[in-house]
Amino acid sequence: GYTTKRDEYKTKMPNKKGAPHYLLYRGDISLLNRENFKKNVAVVGLLNPTADIAEREKAFVAEIIKRGGNIISGLALGCDSIAHKTCLENNGKTIAVLPSRLDNILPRENIDLANEIVVKGGLLVTEYYNEPVERFESSARYIERDRLQAYFSNSIVLVASYRHPDKYSEQYPQDGIKRDSGSRHAMKIAGDIGRKRYVLFNKSTDSLNEMFDLNKDLLSDKKNPAKILTGSELDNLMDGKLPGAIPIFE
């Protein structure tokens, strides 16, 4: 499908450049309407989570679904894939924001997952109908994908992420795996536009683990600190209140 419903975004965005002019999609576009928007939780994180991190992520995603939430992520390997798969395994609805065309799913390893998302009532969305012409443009699309994950969510959860410069191992694995894979971008934009920001963090086990360095940075952010996702905070992820900057499709 294709939509240009810019007039129906109910846009109150502080930076209107952030609003997509159109979206290409497969699946249920109503997952971006007003009522569903209140239930949309973005989940971001690194590409190479440990087994322990993966289990912690699965546990809270399952709880979000149990509470009636929808999951948004970027269809990348690692934490993104875990979020989408756990949602589907728990009979939830998930939205995948793509950095590529709908007919050129990236990464290729997730083509079957993308199809399963649509078959099970979810949604694939992208801003792109053509291929990038150069490496810089291709890299920029991953950053833009991260932006939309933030815009289409009511709240966002960072599973785990390194503190590293912005290079995309997701796209160029030869650059090294120890990157934030866009988590920093998504979390920053979420803060800028008033989304509730949460991180996984256990002081006794995660303090010296570099996989949680970005989590620690966000917790210590003096202007807009993130919160640790606890059992009680799970109920606040979907409190029925709409944030200020909302691109909604009705």
Give residue spans per PLM region:
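Glycine-biased, small-residue-rich flexible motifs in mid-sequence functional cores and linkers
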Residues: 2-250
